[in-house]
Amino acid sequence: MSEFDLTTREGRWRHFGSVDPIEGTKPTVKEEMTDLQSTHKDFLFEIEEVGIKNLVYPVVIDNYQTAGTFAFSTSLTREEKGINMSRILESVEKHYDNGLELSFNNLEAVLHTLEKHMKQSSAGVDVSGKWFFNRYSPVTNIKAVGNADVTYGLAVAGDQVTRKELTVQATVTTLCPCSKEISEYSAHNQRGVITVKMYIDPSATLPTDYKEVILDAMEANASSILYPILKRPDEKRVTERAYENPRFVEDLIRLIAADLVELDWAEGFDIECRNEESIHQHDAFAKLKYRK
């Protein structure tokens, strides 16, 4: 039989090996503890970015609450050993209210708080999440929720924004022009994955629908858009539209670029289009970079 009372939680813990804490000699009061991170001497190099990543936190994107995955960083001078990383979460909490609403303005406010709280000259953030939006079937006009992946990137140095980026990843349908040309019947098609990274002019005024503008350039130039709900009239429309608009991966990336290059608030962009080939075991892809 056990020497402990197994009808109690504490007894079971002791039965499985738990012991009393020791009487330590090190301080237990914060003010008396050694703060190694705040050590000041010559540590040879300054650090451009140091912080935390893979922080999952509730965010709000266009009225939908979702999970955001964050990477926060600040600079670190040559004379400081380290940063107090707990202050990063404290800075985020100051702007949290049942979900941090994702916008460049809100993220900039968080970064300025972080700069001051960490007593550093610069700070940066990258945050990814699901963007949900209403999507209506093309003929029957039935509403459902579509989604795309978005990543905001922002950096500040003092009062200046030094980096402003938005990445959108969405899926579309692409129909093969070669297959259509050589086949007696129909053509093979597949799902295409498009990733667009926009480099935004920090001094420019963004339109309120900037995410929709980017998504439209991606989807409108594909063979067809993807829809959550399709009834038979919708499926007929989608199938025929794809056949009317065949796209090689090379065609798609150039057409998207032609739309994005017209945006006066963009300094440049990176695009990758990847087709998950339906008649091969490999994918097809194309990449394009453009700077104004």
From Swiss-Prot:
Enzyme class name: hydrolase
Site (May be catalytically important): 176
Keywords: Hydrolase
Catalysed conversion reaction: GTP + H2O = 7,8-dihydroneopterin 3'-triphosphate + formate + H(+)
Pathway membership: Cofactor biosynthesis; 7,8-dihydroneopterin triphosphate biosynthesis; 7,8-dihydroneopterin triphosphate from GTP: step 1/1
Molecular-function GO term, any one: GTP cyclohydrolase I activity
Pfam families named among the record's database cross-references: GCHY-1 (PF02649)
Biological processes annotated in GO: tetrahydrofolate biosynthetic process
Keyword Transmembrane helix in record: no
InterPro entries, alphabetized: GTP_cyclohydrolase_FolE2, GTP_cyclohydrolase_FolE2/MptA
Keyword Hydrolase: yes
Matching Gene3D superfamilies: Urate Oxidase
EC number(s) per entry: 3.5.4.16
NCBIfam families recorded: PRK13674.1-1
Family: Belongs to the GTP cyclohydrolase IV family.
Function of the molecule: Converts GTP to 7,8-dihydroneopterin triphosphate.
Name the UniProt record assigns to this protein: GTP cyclohydrolase FolE2
Gene (UniProt): folE2
